Regions:
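Catalytic core of pol beta-like nucleotidyltransferases
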Residues: 1-30, 38-44, 53-103
Length: 103
């Protein structure tokens, strides 16, 4: 996994900062960007795929959809539940860590 680069992902820094702020607010442990935006082969209207672990996952998901300054849609996956081995492998291979809580 690597760090965020606006050119690579097409996501404005303001939106990333809003995601990080919400992750802290809802005590999320880790937020990983994956999918076409992490791979760099996204289209202008591609959604933003996020994998999240820890914290108030449901509240974080709702807040990201409602409170970020983008019209792009979000697909938020809870890593603590129901993530298939195939999806976990994709996230591990292509994921970009946007936020990780320091203990």
């Amino acid at each position: 996994m690597c760090k965020h680069n606006q050119i690579q992902t097409g996501i404005k820094s303001d939106v990333i900062n809003e995601i990080i702020k919400l992750a802290k607010k809802f005590d999320v442990h880790k937020v990983i960007l994956f999918g076409s935006r992490a791979r760099g082969n996204f289209q202008e209207k591609s959604d933003i795929d996020l994998a999240v672990s820890g914290g108030e996952w449901g509240m974080f998901r709702l807040a990201v959809e409602e409170e970020t300054s983008t019209l792009l849609k979000f697909d938020v996956v809870n890593l603590d539940k129901c993530a298939s081995n195939e999806l976990l492998a994709v996230i591990e291979r292509e994921g970009i860590v946007l936020y990780e809580k320091i203990w």
